[in-house]
């Protein structure tokens, strides 16, 4: 996963909404999102090379579970240019996990363990998001750089093994809208800033799901003077600056919209691009 915007407790009845693009090399085999045969309550894509995932949810009643037809629309409570927090007393029945890599080619270890297993292991577990972070924290430096976003139905936690300077690292996030790419949470990369603002606008408008997929299909590249410097060649930096990445060997392979409901199983809709 290389770009994810998400809203936590700003939409009544829907504690978590996320929209994301997964960017990957085209020759890396993967499986589209669906229930996992060995663990049917997990609904996620799968990396067929290392066995982990980049994003997924749990549906506690398995692949045949149903949800009400009249669940809340995706409309946030917007006020004074921001969002009114929405408190939900009950724990949502589904879990959510997503990961992005931190782009640092000079700090990449090809022998490091698979970061995708951090997602699949959380989805298969029952511990809280904070407890899971504390479990993996001692060995986190062994992985290449990553950001994890974890929801246990009660709290949403962001954790990065490169995020020590940020006080939010490993702690429950406050209600709000967030953006994450291949740097730390809310880093002001052009595509993060732009997509986060558009996502917030769609939430205030109560836009249909199709609008979120249109947002994720934006191929606009950032001007050179606004590109981050991450250690890759300039032309690659230009390619990677788009929300939807297009290049001969690497690009956006799936777009996904996830809704974690307060009183119904989570819904994950994925568009496979390549």
Please give the residue ranges for each predicted region:
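N-terminal nucleophile
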Residues: 1-78, 83-274
């Amino acid at each position: 996963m290389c770009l994810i915007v998400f809203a936590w407790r700003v939409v009544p009845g829907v504690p978590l909404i996320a929209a994301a693009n997964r960017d990957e090399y085209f020759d890396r085999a993967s499986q589209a999102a669906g229930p996992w045969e060995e663990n049917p309550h997990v609904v996620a894509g799968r990396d067929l090379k290392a066995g982990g995932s980049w994003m997924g949810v749990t549906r506690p009643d398995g692949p045949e579970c149903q949800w009400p037809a009249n669940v809340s629309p995706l409309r946030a409570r917007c006020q004074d240019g921001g969002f009114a927090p929405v408190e939900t007393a009950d724990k949502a029945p589904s879990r959510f996990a997503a990961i992005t890599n931190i782009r640092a080619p000079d700090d990449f270890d090809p022998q490091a363990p698979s970061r995708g297993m951090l997602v699949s292991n959380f989805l298969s577990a029952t511990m809280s998001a904070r407890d899971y972070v504390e479990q993996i924290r001692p060995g986190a430096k062994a992985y290449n750089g990553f950001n994890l976003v974890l929801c246990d139905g009660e709290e949403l936690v962001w954790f990065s093994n490169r995020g020590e300077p940020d006080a939010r690292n490993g702690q429950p996030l406050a209600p709000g809208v967030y953006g994450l790419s291949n740097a730390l949470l809310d880093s002001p990369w052009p595509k993060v800033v732009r997509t986060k603002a558009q996502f917030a606008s769609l939430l205030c408008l109560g836009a249909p799901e199709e609008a979120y997929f249109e947002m994720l299909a934006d191929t606009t590249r950032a001007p050179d003077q606004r590109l981050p410097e991450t250690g890759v060649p300039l032309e690659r930096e230009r390619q990677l600056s788009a929300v939807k990445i297009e290049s001969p060997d690497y690009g956006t392979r799936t777009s996904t919209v996830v809704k974690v409901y307060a009183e119904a199983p989570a819904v994950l809709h994925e568009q496979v691009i390549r």
